[in-house]
């Protein structure tokens, strides 16, 4: 049994959306990423080395969208934002703001359970240098569209970084500049409320561009919106 939380749709349309929401374990769409997966698998055969599936509550009102799996994070563990510094900040913040319960222990079989939220990535496979190419974003975007459509109660989306913001907007058939970039920007995007955040990467936290308090305020804003 997979260690991440399974998603069980309740209707035929949701079932179809769900089937389109998660790429195949051996997804062939992006040749460069396929080669990178193969190289990682050869060097580290005990790692997950595949498209990291979405993780969280199938009835979530909040979807959190990151950039892509980190090589030694989700690419290693098989769960988004698990096993690296970005995940520590993200899941600590979700626990603090009531969007998670249990204990985050940087492995997919810990006791962490997401509540009313789901975590996914704009690009599902780890890219070299953590930088997906434009064509890789395009190839993966239908999964993001379907992921949103498969969440029947979705109302809010937090984008972690500009790649996530841009891909969410395009997945909604909006222009990439339909919502301004920048931390703390909130705006309607199609049927959803979009909350922009700087990515919770080690680089952003080490340089002070993003502080734990700034990050927490994003999720408190989401909480206020959902409770209004």
Residue locations for each model-derived region?
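A polyanion-binding, active-site-adjacent surface
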Residues: 16-181, 187-228
